[in-house]
């Protein structure tokens, strides 16, 4: 009798737990740790904020630039904290901080998804963040500055720009990640470029997206990155897997994927467009311009790709 009562109580508790889970999950879903995995969101550091790079609609003035350093000409790269460098140009303020950036070009000159070049032309010019420096001497024709924060080696000719403090991104608690969330109708765009011209992207990496403050985007907003299977179908590499056989010798009627005369089979036809889009990760906005956003990948279920879609994710 005691055993029966114990089993009944256990059944009631289990039923209650499932009911509670169903109430907290979106309509049309049963939440499990597979389709709603827990996401541990990374918090951006000071280096993440100030070393992310950016894409700017217009070119930055280049009248102020790095001319050399204490050990010129024997040293042509400057990166150590506290290292002294010389700044050419006018209007430097003693004790003021400045930002050292580099106007970039892609040495590969190859589109990684259709339309990338056209999107980038609309977005503007990519820049790398190299360092934050402070002017310590203005008695000569060139100002002397020391490096306070180094992101990457500085070279002669790199641009010196005004510095602005950035607000830290608040810690984000862990939450459930909806892998198959449909479009929410919020502002959306694409990952067009990544820092260092990377193409396979994961947690901690920086990306540049083609929407900004003109679309209401602000620092601290979160984007959900997603990919459709149609994108894989049109990718020169990923599409090879769609073309490979999925059949097994014991399968009487194997299916066709996007059936045509060459791939016709006696089984059902699978239309790639009917497969659900899948969410691949979360991106937090570190910086915005009117037409672009710089983001950091703070959670990734799989590699993100250039060309992946992004959609504003109300947290």
For every predicted segment, state its role.
Residues 2-5, 18-315:
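Surface-exposed, polar/charged interaction patches used for macromolecular assembly or partner binding
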